[in-house]
């Protein structure tokens, strides 16, 4: 019997409650054994803010998931030089864990970008994409995507960074404390 592992990639700059809820909902609704959080170094589709270092983002992720045994962090993309593509990461993971079915979790806002992903036609054969339904993002794409529902959470890392003084409610308590202690995102 194959293992079922979810993967949630992102910049996690900072990791927030919506990331946590997405992972929890995907795990529960799809019966996944564990969730791997996959922090990106240089996502090809985004400009990096550079606000928190790789180490700080990983530390915040660790704080967010430390009480959840079935949640782990995979830092392989942070170790790569240059751009890091999901295709390369998944090729490596499948080679390392051939007895595992991978479920790549994306927010509803990312579904419309799938056709632009590097080697997407190969990637959709390697993983099952899981789209988290969000009312504002109902874009259809020519790929099979498992959809899961979760309550609307209007949270984004960009908004949190831009208004850090009012972001406490959107962050796990330990992540908020870390941001204050390390004076990230202008928080003094």
From Swiss-Prot:
Keywords: ATP-binding, NAD, Nucleotide-binding, Nucleotidyltransferase, Pyridine nucleotide biosynthesis, Transferase. InterPro entries: Cyt_trans-like (IPR004821), NadD/NMNAT (IPR005248), Rossmann-like_a/b/a_fold (IPR014729). Catalyzes the reversible adenylation of nicotinate mononucleotide (NaMN) to nicotinic acid adenine dinucleotide (NaAD). Pathway: Cofactor biosynthesis; NAD(+) biosynthesis; deamido-NAD(+) from nicotinate D-ribonucleotide: step 1/1. Pfam families: CTP_transf_like (PF01467). This is Probable nicotinate-nucleotide adenylyltransferase. Its EC number is 2.7.7.18. It catalyses: nicotinate beta-D-ribonucleotide + ATP + H(+) = deamido-NAD(+) + diphosphate. Coiled coil: none annotated. Belongs to the NadD family. One of its GO terms (biological process) is NAD biosynthetic process. SUPFAM superfamilies: Nucleotidylyl transferase. CDD domains: NMNAT. The gene is nadD. GO terms for molecular function: ATP binding; nicotinate-nucleotide adenylyltransferase activity.
